[in-house]
Amino acid sequence: MSETKSKVLVLGGLGYIGSCFIDQLLKQYPDVTVSVIDINHTSLALQLLPRQVNVHFVNLLDRAQLTDTIAQINPDVVFHFAAKTSVKESTEQPLTYFDHNLVGTLNLLHALKELQKPIQLFFSSTAAVFGSASTLPIPENLVLEETLASNPYGISKFLSEIVLQTLTRSPHFQVIALRYFNVAGASNPFGNFNKNTTLLIPNLIKAFMEKRTFFLYGDDYDTKDGSCIRDYIHVVDLCDAHLLAWKWLQANPKVRFESFNLGSGQGFSNWEVINTAQAIFAPEQLQLKIESRRAGDPPVLVVDCTKAKRLLNFQPTRSLHKMLSDETIFYRDFYNRL
């Protein structure tokens, strides 16, 4: 089935990445049928999504309601963005993360299996499955082990990947696991609507705009400037990668399971991110306070996305400055006006 005729289900479509993805999806394929499953009745994305998007408020932990809803939607393609994603919170509430991320995914798979038809599933995984990997940049062919992930969030995604890879031995599922590194930027007017986000860049931008203190967690890592180093990817580049993965899977029907790293291949320290933001907001000065490290944060995460470039023809094009400037526009022009 061609992309333009597909029925697409987006789980977590009212969240940051999910809503940006729908925006990019409809720009490229305006005639696809899009349905969303989410639990966030108050998401600002509800005010922005076009009327053609059908939104269903269903908790993935309610298997009966989820099964009924998916039977009604009868999707051909599923993009699974729904998850709890805070590393810090996962160390405090590990069972909650296993429930939402692992059990929720299992319930989704049960519901999709009931359709008794082939399904293409694109799973939002994470760099956290690698933990503090000793090989940098982190290659896609690194053998995942349960002990590799350094926090319950990463473990929940690792276990989900194992389940998905096992299920692709059946004829019903084709699965692509897309391992995100740090996502930033916006697909304006869509962006990170989460008022309680723990991500560095939105909190940094809000600190500048609201003239409040920004907390830097850890300046004593074994890195070039003592702060964590992360690989960042613009959310629009990330969405483009999902659409390229879909097109690639359509052209390769014999593929059962594949995983791709999605990042820029370049590491930026927290101090470098702060300095880039400082240049955007100059002459405004950041109020900064250094705190102790957060539990579960590896010192360095940088990706090798050679396979994504080779197979998907994926090449991120948006710089760190572009990520910060787009997200600044989102918070200035859209976030506080909704």
From Swiss-Prot:
E.C. numbers: 5.1.3.2
Residues bound to NAD(+): 16-17, 37-42, 59-60, 81-85, 126, 153, 157, 181
Catalysis: reaction(s): UDP-alpha-D-glucose = UDP-alpha-D-galactose
Keywords carried by this UniProt record: Carbohydrate metabolism, Galactose metabolism, Isomerase, NAD
Molecular function GO terms recorded: UDP-glucose 4-epimerase activity
Cofactor(s) it depends on: NAD(+)
Gene3D superfamilies, sorted: NAD(P)-binding Rossmann-like Domain (3.40.50.720), UDP-galactose 4-epimerase, domain 1 (3.90.25.10)
InterPro entries (alphabetical): Epimerase_deHydtase, NAD(P)-bd_dom_sf, UDP_G4E
GO-annotated biological processes: galactose catabolic process via UDP-galactose, Leloir pathway
Residue sites binding substrate per the record: 126, 153, 182, 198-199, 215-217, 230, 294-297
Subunit field text: Homodimer.
Full protein name: UDP-glucose 4-epimerase
